[in-house]
């Protein structure tokens, strides 16, 4: 028995000693191989289901206790940096919609429309999306934690934290801080099991879908993914460069390696909140800031969603022979950006906001829902890339706002933001 326990400890030490990224890549490879060789062994996919469920269950509690604890301690500093984060989230979402309009004009797409998709809730206009957001803000806080309604969670956490700050004694505040630390530790344990979760998620996707999504709608999918990559590799980094005046790609690479990879397979910005918070800690960001900005980003920083809504609406217009003027294209960018900010509050996310954008061009709801149906077909890949972009950029822009403030204060940035030559000159170790 002693030999068995010793062997188990040895395996655990090897597992924990390896980099999380390396373990995730190994899980990805194993999941793909198993899906191609043993697609009938469906229980392997349960690892992915359990992993995503655990993250989704823990994330709302984590957000509530971190924000409430920070405010109760009196350490929350929602200063000018928060305004910068908010601006970056909203501006880049609009920029993503503009980029999508440009790529759609350069590479116009048409659709082969078939049976209309069915949906329980479809927003009919921008006013309905805004109304949904406002309603979500004042929802029941317990129900908000159950549903993962982060706008509501943030509001109640702020109110609860401010109330605790004014009436609670030091021992109560210390207890809240301990609860926040305990929840954070639980999240670390869950994230440590990410390789098994990724293995299950990859297994399910490959076994169920294979490469079928590429065959019928390959050009549309290529435009969607290409536009998102353009935002990731060109326009997003350009915004970061304007604020930091230095090479943005070390930060971009770090965020996509540690946040985007996980988000690609979980396909949920909410489930990736704990991963993003852990990454923010590694990047040296202020906990009082990122505990608010990251869950807010998961709600309103929707670059990928804005791209999806815009391109699908433009494709629908092209299919029906509708000529889109420049003013109409600009209006579409605004509507797509605002609508994308409400994607987290709508069942089905960005795809079910397509009819709202289509309504700008007088496209009937029946036809718009057929476009949604096409979206569901390519959704396995489109949604993965979209979530990857959305989630990784949450950290990118939170870090950009923080580092921008550091530079104004004369502080040095983390070592990875400097070149080898600069590190040697400044005496910084990598």
UniProtKB/Swiss-Prot annotation:
Molecular functions per Gene Ontology: amino acid transmembrane transporter activity; symporter activity
Topology class, membrane: Multi-pass membrane protein
Localization terms from the record: Cell membrane
Record-linked HAMAP family: Ser_Thr_transp_SstT
Gene Ontology cellular-component annotations: plasma membrane
Protein name: Serine/threonine transporter SstT
GO BP terms, alphabetized: serine transport; threonine transport
Catalytic activity: L-serine(in) + Na(+)(in) = L-serine(out) + Na(+)(out); L-threonine(in) + Na(+)(in) = L-threonine(out) + Na(+)(out)
Keyword Cell membrane (UniProt): yes
Record's keyword terms, sorted: Amino-acid transport, Cell membrane, Membrane, Symport, Transmembrane, Transmembrane helix, Transport
Family, similarity comment: Belongs to the dicarboxylate/amino acid:cation symporter (DAACS) (TC 2.A.23) family.
Record function comment: Involved in the import of serine and threonine into the cell, with the concomitant import of sodium (symport system).
Tagged with keyword Iron: no
The encoding gene: sstT
InterPro entries: Na-dicarboxylate_symporter, Na:dicarbo_symporter_sf, Ser_Thr_transp_SstT
Gene3D superfamilies for the chain: Sodium:dicarboxylate symporter
Transmembrane parts of this sequence: 24-44, 47-67, 82-102, 144-164, 186-206, 223-243, 294-314, 320-340, 361-381
């Amino acid at each position: 028995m002693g030999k068995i326990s010793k062997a188990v400890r040895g395996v655990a030490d090897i597992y924990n000693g390896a980099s999380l990224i390396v373990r995730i890549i190994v899980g990805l490879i194993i999941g793909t191989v198993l899906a191609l060789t043993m697609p009938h062994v469906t229980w392997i996919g349960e690892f992915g289901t359990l992993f995503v469920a655990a993250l989704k269950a823990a994330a709302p509690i984590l957000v509530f206790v971190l924000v409430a604890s920070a405010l109760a301690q009196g350490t929350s500093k929602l200063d000018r940096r928060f305004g910068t984060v908010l601006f970056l989230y909203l501006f880049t979402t609009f920029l993503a919609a503009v980029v999508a309009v440009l790529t759609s004009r350069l590479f116009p797409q048409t659709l082969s429309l078939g049976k209309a998709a069915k949906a329980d809730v479809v927003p009919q206009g921008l006013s309905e999306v805004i109304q949904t957001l406002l309603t979500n803000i004042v929802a029941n806080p317990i129900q908000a934690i159950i549903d993962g309604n982060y706008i509501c969670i943030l509001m109640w956490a702020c109110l609860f934290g401010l109330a605790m700050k004014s009436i609670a004694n030091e021992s109560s505040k210390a207890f809240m801080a301990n609860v926040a630390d305990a929840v954070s530790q639980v999240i670390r344990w869950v994230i440590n099991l990410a390789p098994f979760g990724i293995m299950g998620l990859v297994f399910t996707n490959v076994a169920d879908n294979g490469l079928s999504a590429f065959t019928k709608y390959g050009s549309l999918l290529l435009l969607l993914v290409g536009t998102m990559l353009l935002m990731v590799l060109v326009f997003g980094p350009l915004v970061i460069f304007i604020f930091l005046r230095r090479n943005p790609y070390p930060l971009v690479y770090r965020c996509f390696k540690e946040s985007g990879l996980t988000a690609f397979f979980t396909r949920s910005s909410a489930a990736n909140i704990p991963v993003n918070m852990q990454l923010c800690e590694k990047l040296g960001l202020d906990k009082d800031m990122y505990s608010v900005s990251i869950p807010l980003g998961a709600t309103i920083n929707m670059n990928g969603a804005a791209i999806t809504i815009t391109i699908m609406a433009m494709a629908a217009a092209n299919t029906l022979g509708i000529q889109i003027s420049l003013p109409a294209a600009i209006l579409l960018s605004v509507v797509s950006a605002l609508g994308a900010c409400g994607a987290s509050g709508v069942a089905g996310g960005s795809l079910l906001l397509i009819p709202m954008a289509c309504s700008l061009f007088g496209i009937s709801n029946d036809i718009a829902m057929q476009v949604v149906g096409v979206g569901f077909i390519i959704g396995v890949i489109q949604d993965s890339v979209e979530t990857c972009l959305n989630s990784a950029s949450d950290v990118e822009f939170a870090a950009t706002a923080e580092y921008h403030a550091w530079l104004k204060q004369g502080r040095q940035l983390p070592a990875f933001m400097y070149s080898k030559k600069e590190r040697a000159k400044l005496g910084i170790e990598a």
